[in-house]
């Protein structure tokens, strides 16, 4: 599975430069964690590491519990993909790549709420059949770094309903962030 082969030298400190083209293609940003694997054939493999992805089944269970309580679509994401989803519309978003609008919202940190009065936001790059009119997004912070988000989306877009979802989203994001720190 060799898509690209580039020869690089290791410097005195043992560092290898990953070319900008490869970083851009694989969406590797400065400061992103990478796992390093070795094989018996002398290969060194780098893999993007997602702390939120490590939560796996736990994140899925948390999303299901939150969806049952709120009747909203609940998405738990890392910085690029929807890791866990529950509620109406789950199949459309689970495992999908996040839209640029959502990625930008995650990078802003904190909690962001959009209502039906504004333009609807697609959670993923894939076109959703019914765009949510209201979204509450809370960034998951772990050791001061933004690792992903908890997104609660509501079809009606009513501000009162979104205000009720906001503390639940913040609590979920804080809980998952603290869980990753351990």
Question: Which residue stretches match the model-derived regions?
Answer:
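Short beta->alpha transition motifs characteristic of CBS
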Residues: 85-91, 151-156
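Short beta-strand-centered segments at strand-helix junctions
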Residues: 14-26
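Short hydrophobic alpha-helical segments used for membrane anchoring or interfacial signaling
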Residues: 73-85
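Regulatory sensory and allosteric helical modules in signal-transduction proteins
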Residues: 85, 91-127
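Short hydrophobic/glycine-rich mini-motifs in sensory/regulatory modules
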Residues: 42, 140-150
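Juxtadomain coupling helices with adjacent low-complexity linkers
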Residues: 56-65, 97-103, 148-182
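Short regulatory alpha-helical segment in sensory/regulatory domains of signaling proteins that mediates
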Residues: 63-74
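A short, aliphatic-rich beta-strand micro-motif
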Residues: 133-141
């Amino acid at each position: 599975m060799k898509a690209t082969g580039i020869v690089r030298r290791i410097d005195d400190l043992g560092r290898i430069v990953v070319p900008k083209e490869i970083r851009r293609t694989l969406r590797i940003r400065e400061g992103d964690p990478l796992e390093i694997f070795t094989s018996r054939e002398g290969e060194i493999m780098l893999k993007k590491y997602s702390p939120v992805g490590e939560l796996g089944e736990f994140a899925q269970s948390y999303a299901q519990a939150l969806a049952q309580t709120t009747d909203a679509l609940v998405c738990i994401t890392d910085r690029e993909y929807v890791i866990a989803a529950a509620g109406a519309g789950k199949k459309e978003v689970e495992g999908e790549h996040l839209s640029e609008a959502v990625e930008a919202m995650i990078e802003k940190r904190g909690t962001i709420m959009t209502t039906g009065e504004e333009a609807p936001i697609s959670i993923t790059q894939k076109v959703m059949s019914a765009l949510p009119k209201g979204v509450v997004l809370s960034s998951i912070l772990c050791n001061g770094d933004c690792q992903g988000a908890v997104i609660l989306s509501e079809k009606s877009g009513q501000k009162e309903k979104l205000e009720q979802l906001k503390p639940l989203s913040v609590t979920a994001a804080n809980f998952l962030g603290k869980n990753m720190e351990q």
